[in-house]
Amino acid sequence: METHPGLEIWWDSSPLIYSNWSGGLLKKAAPDRLGELREQLKRLYDPEHPEMALFRGVTTNPPLSLQVIKARESFVAQIVDDLMEKNPCIDKEALFWVTYKEIVRRGAEMYLGVFQRSQYRYGYLSGQVDPRVLTDKEKMIAQALELASLSPNVMIKVPGSKQGYEVIKFLTSKGISTNNTLTFVLPQLMACAKAVKEGLEIAKQNGVDLTHWRSVITHMTARYGDLGDLRREAESLKIDLSEADVRWAELAIFKKAYRLVEKGGYPSKMLICSMRISPIMNGKKYCWHLEKLAGGNIVFTCPPSFIEAVFESLDGTEFRPQIDEEVPKTVLDKLLRIPYFEKAYHEDGLAPHEFNTHPALVATATEFSKATEGMVDFVAKRLAAKCG
C-alpha cells in the first residue's frame, strides 16, 4: 500500500466468516509465528475496531456466499428459520433471495464504521445480482434496487453482459454504487467505464445525491487466462505459451485498461481479483498480479485462500511501483498472434453482444449459477423440514 496512496486492499469473502477463517489460521500456525500472525490478522480486520482495518472494502459472489453456509451452517440455518417465521408462505427461490439479502446486510453492517469514518470513501460491500439472470435487464435492476436499500454502503455487483452495462448506466444515474463483475477483456472494461461516465452525467443533470456513490471495475484476471481459449488457440497455432506468458496476457489487459481509465478521466477505479501465486521461475514463487501492478491507484481484493498463500510464499517480498512498466515487446507480439488475446486487448475487439458468449464469462457464470443453486438447495431443505 506504500507504493501509492490510493491503493486499496479489500476482503474477497463475506465478513461473516472472517473470525472463523482467522481463528482456523491461528490454530494451524507454528508456535513461534503465532504472535506475529495474530497481529497481522488483527491489522487486516479487527472486529472491535473495524474503522482501523487495513481492508477498506469487501467483495462477495455466489461461491463466497455459499462458503458462509458451509463455514457457519447453524448460524445461517437460524437466519433461514427466522425468515420463514416472518414469511410463512414463501417458496424456495424467494427464501433464498431474502436469506442472501440478510447475509449482505449483516456483512455491510460490519463495515459501516469504515464507511462512516472515511466520509463514505471506503467501507463498501459488494452484493451481487443473481448470475442466473445476467441477460435480464429488468430483473437485475429490480434486484439491484433491493440490495441497495439494505445499507448505504452496499455496492451492487453487476455482470459484464451487454444488458449488464445498461443496468450499470441506469444504477449510476440513480446514484447507486456499482462493481462490474464477470469482466475479462478490454472491450468489457471500457464499456463499463463509458456506461458509468454516461450514467454519472445524467445523475448530475438531475441533481441526484452522489454522497454515497462509488464505482469500481473488476478484472477477473487469472480467470481470463485459465478459463478461456488462450492456451487452446496458442496450441493450435503452434505458439508456445509459458506460465509467465499467460500471466503477462492477463496483466497486459489490466495495465491497458488502467491507463485508459486514468488518462480518460473516467470516474471509476480499477479492481483486480482472481489473483494467483504465479509464475514459478527458477524455483522461486512470484505473484505478478501483485508485484507488476504495485504503484497503481487500484483495488486488490483478496480471498482467504490467496491471503494464506501470500503469507506462506511471499513473506519478505519487497514491492516497488511497476504499474507503468510495459509488457515485454517480444511477449506482447507473440500474444497478439493469438485471436483470443488480440480481441481481448483492443478496445473494439468484441461487440457488446459478444460479451455474453465469451468463454470465460460463460464458464464463470455457470460456476456462480451452480453456487447459487447450492444456496437455494440449502434453504429448500430448511423449508421442507418445516413445512413437510
Q: Where are the regions a protein language model picked out?
A:
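Catalytic alpha/beta core domains of metabolic enzymes, predominantly
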Residues: 177-323
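Active-site-adjacent beta->alpha loops and helix N-cap segments on the catalytic face
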Residues: 135-140, 158-172, 185-196, 282-283, ...
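Active-site beta->alpha loop and helix N-cap motifs at the rims of alpha/beta catalytic domains
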Residues: 52-55, 62-163, 167
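Hydrophobic faces of well-ordered beta-strands that scaffold small-molecule active sites
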Residues: 7-13, 30-39, 56-60, 123-129, ...
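Glycine-rich tight-turn/loop motif centered on a GG-T
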Residues: 30, 73-98, 176-179, 231-247
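C-terminal extensions of enzymes
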Residues: 317-388
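Generic structural signal for well-ordered alpha-helices
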Residues: 100-112, 141-145, 168, 189, ...
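N-terminal capping/small domains of soluble enzymes
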Residues: 1-78, 163
